[in-house]
């Protein structure tokens, strides 16, 4: 057999073994498939676990949204003390992500845009006995539409839990009213 054929077969064997070893490796591949974000930071896992806890317990959560000229006022609460505590953890954690630009759910167009404009948003958070009251505003009309659309989606998370969280959410159109 000519040397080039043996080299070709040997290269093929090495390629096959490399793929086979990777296919059966204990650790998942490090390639990011879905997300477009900056990757995990030191608080990502804790934030995700809190979000998943809230989605799992969505039926124990109540939420009201009041549209304002420059944003929204929301009250998100639960009669369950454990759920109320998680709401009080989740909201300021997400505000920190807004301010830092280190968002989550970049695969979801609305969330990507929300975090893109996070520095143009002002948020006042106050704990209630059973959760949080938030006033979120902006001086930018486009950002106000994003804030209001985000509030609607969060209300859908409360209503439907994981069913809604697995969906992508479109950006509000410029013609949408406040």
Residue spans for each PLM region:
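A low-complexity, Ser/Thr/Gly/Pro-enriched, surface-exposed linker/loop concept
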Residues: 27-58, 82-119, 154, 158-172
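Short, solvent-exposed mixed-charge patches
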Residues: 176-178
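Bacterial N-terminal signal peptides that target proteins for export
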Residues: 2-12
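Terminal, regulation- and interaction-focused segments at domain boundaries
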Residues: 27-33, 66-82, 130-131, 135
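Bacterial N-terminal signal peptides
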Residues: 11-22
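Primarily extracytoplasmic ectodomains and periplasmic/lumenal surface modules that are beta-strand-rich
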Residues: 71-72, 79-85, 93-95, 140-144
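Short, solvent-exposed interaction modules
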Residues: 109-139
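Short, well-ordered, aromatic-rich surface patches in folded extracellular/luminal domains
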Residues: 127-164
């Amino acid at each position: 057999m000519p040397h080039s054929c043996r080299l070709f077969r040997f290269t093929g064997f090495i390629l096959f073994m490399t793929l086979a070893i990777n296919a059966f490796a204990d650790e998942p591949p490090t390639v990011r498939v879905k997300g477009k974000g900056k990757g995990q930071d030191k608080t990502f896992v804790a934030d995700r676990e809190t979000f998943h806890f809230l989605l799992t317990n969505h039926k124990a959560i109540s939420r009201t949204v009041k549209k304002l000229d420059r944003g929204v006022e929301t009250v998100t609460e639960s009669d369950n003390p454990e759920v109320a505590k998680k709401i009080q953890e989740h909201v300021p954690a997400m505000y920190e992500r807004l301010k830092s630009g280190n968002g989550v759910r970049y695969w979801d167009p609305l969330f990507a845009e929300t975090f893109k404009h996070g520095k143009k948003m002002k948020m006042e958070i106050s704990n209630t006995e059973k959760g949080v009251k938030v006033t979120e505003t902006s001086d930018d009309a486009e950002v106000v539409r994003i804030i209001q659309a985000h509030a609607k989606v969060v209300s859908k998370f409360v209503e439907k839990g994981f069913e809604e969280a697995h969906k992508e959410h479109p950006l509000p159109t410029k013609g949408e009213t406040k």
